[in-house]
Curated annotation (Swiss-Prot):
Protein species of origin: Adiantum capillus-veneris (Maidenhair fern)
GO CC term (a single one): chloroplast thylakoid membrane
Encoding gene per record: ndhD
EC code(s) of this entry: 7.1.1.-
Domain of life: Eukaryota
Keyword NADP carried by entry: yes
Keyword Nuclease among UniProt keywords: no
UniProt membrane topology term: Multi-pass membrane protein
Enzyme class name: translocase
Name of the protein this chain belongs to: NAD(P)H-quinone oxidoreductase chain 4, chloroplastic
Length: 497
């Protein structure tokens, strides 16, 4: 579908240009900067919603709202944007999560202008990545995230923030090298004039050995972001030290960039290599679920416990994509959106607990259920959502991944049975570490009592943020077609099934 207005360029550019305007805002405290940034985020989300309702056709199974402009001719880089069901779902998630993360950052009082500037730059870069139709532009948007996250970690992180930020940069930059080499190889192979346009690259073919090498190059970059075991070790350190509003963006959006790349590039452009390596992806995804769950159970720091739970849940995304079935891929897409909501909400809850106690150590906490019933109720409800309680979004997504594995025609019965058993063990381990965390936080001895100055229950702003997360979690769980009716339009053809 073609529109006279370049809507995608507008939603990519608006946060970036709005962020560049922050230095000229009045310097009379933090209030103006806060409300300005929140207003931009709300405006951006309203524009995304408008585009979805007025310019996007769910029944049209192709890229819509295409925009292509020459940008840098010397390197054949085009400003090429387009949107389909996969990208639209993640764009909506990005707008929703970023708006609530901005509101959650209200207590920050140090260098607020720089903080909100970095958040807006991240916002524009994430939207740009999900709508890119040029593989070099995709890489450019991929790299935009690096500096804002590094600075957010360094300036507003915990005691080990420099170590965590450096580790994040090394992992991400290392993966980006593989991504760039793979993208250049794909674009230059067999062409006198290189083309980075994804639509053109769909029709290119490669020798199988070269296709596998290109696939692995992309996979390494995505394995860092997603993350996939064993490239995950940056994530617990980063989440453990970052401010909780930054964690909301990391868990809610940043991790989904890897899953999006696996579907958009590896599955769509490198189908034969994906068929060959899909079983390995499923195996590593299953190992990741078990491994991260076991490590999570041993964490005394409950923020790191939530971080390891994120790694475990993203294993279902890897399995769903590797299943090579439409059901499994739909489950992976739904799991990305579901975890984006649940993970961001849990990190916000972890931050609200820290604001009151100044500690993340479970053995120093307990007894909060009586003095803070609202916090207890929301933490319990969202933890149940994380362990895939029926009626919540996580249940539907994990069920679809299970069904995708079982119904796949590409793998032997023994292999599918083994993956299914490992997934089942993971779903059993999840309530163990989550319910144990709830018990240590809210029961036990009375750290929180009526005389304790930290025993302050959730305020209106915090309740509003959590309810905003909870409503779509329940909505998707009760009526998953809210997402599947959008996401199913973009599933690439699977000629080998």
């Amino acid at each position: 579908m073609i529109s006279n207005v370049p809507w995608l360029t507008v939603i990519v550019s608006l946060p970036i240009f709005a962020g560049l305007m922050i230095p000229i805002l009045p310097r009379n405290g933090n209030r103006v900067t806060r409300w300005y940034t929140l207003g931009i985020c709300i405006l951006e989300f309203l524009l995304i919603t408008y585009i979805f309702y007025c310019h996007f056709r769910i029944d049209y199974q192709s890229i819509q709202l295409l925009e292509t402009f020459n940008w840098i001719n010397n390197i054949h880089l085009h400003w090429s944007l387009g949107i389909d069901g996969l990208s639209l779902g993640l764009v909506i998630l990005t707008g929703f999560a970023t708006t609530l993360a901005t509101l959650s950052a209200w207590p920050i009082t140090r260098n607020t202008r720089l903080f909100y500037f970095l958040m807006l730059i991240m916002y524009g870069g994430q939207i740009g990545l999900f709508v890119s139709r040029d593989i070099l532009l995709f890489f450019f948007m991929w790299e935009i995230e690096l500096i804002p996250v590094y600075l957010l970690l360094c300036l507003w992180g915990g005691k080990r923030r420099l170590y965590s930020a450096t580790k994040f940069v090394l992992y991400t930059a290392g993966g980006s090298i593989f991504l760039l080499v793979a993208a250049l190889t794909m674009s230059f192979y067999g062409s006198e004039v290189p083309s980075f346009n994804i639509q053109d690259l769909i029709h290119k073919s490669y020798p199988l050995s070269l296709e596998v090498l290109i696939y692995v190059g992309f996979l390494v970059a995505y394995a860092v972001k997603l993350p996939i075991f064993p490239f995950h070790t940056w994530l617990p350190d980063t989440h453990g030290e970052a401010h909780y509003s930054t964690c909301m963006l990391l868990a809610g959006v940043l991790l989904k960039m890897g899953g999006y790349g696996l579907i958009r590039i590896n599955l769509e452009l490198l189908t034969h290599a994906h068929f060959l390596l899909g079983s390995w992806m499923m195996l590593f995804g299953a190992i990741q679920i078990i491994y991260a769950s076991l490590i999570s159970m041993s964490q005394r720091n409950f923020k790191r416990r939530i971080a390891y739970s994120s790694i475990s849940h993203m294993g279902f995304v890897t399995i769903g994509i590797g299943s090579f079935t439409e059901t499994g891929i739909n489950g992976a897409i739904l799991q990305m959106i579901s975890h984006g909501l649940i993970g961001a909400a849990l990190f916000f809850l972890a931050g609200t607990c820290y604001d009151r106690t100044r500690t993340y150590l479970l053995d120093q906490l307990g007894g909060a259920a009586i003095s803070m019933p609202k916090l207890f109720t929301m933490f319990s409800t969202l933890s149940l959502a994380s362990l895939a309680l029926p009626g919540m979004s996580g249940f539907v997504s994990e069920l679809l991944v299970f069904l995708g594995v079982v119904t796949s025609n590409q793998y032997s019965f023994a292999f599918k049975a083994g993956i299914t058993v490992l997934e089942g063990i993971g779903t059993v381990l999840t309530p163990i570490y989550l319910l144990s965390m709830l018990r240590q936080l809210f029961y036990g001895y009375r750290f929180f009592d009526k005389s304790n100055p930290y025993s302050i229950d959730l305020g209106p702003r915090e309740l509003f943020i959590l309810i905003c997360f909870l409503l779509p979690i329940l909505g998707i769980g009760l009526y998953p077609n809210l997402i599947l009716s959008i996401g199913s339009t973009e599933i690439p053809s699977l000629p080998l099934t």
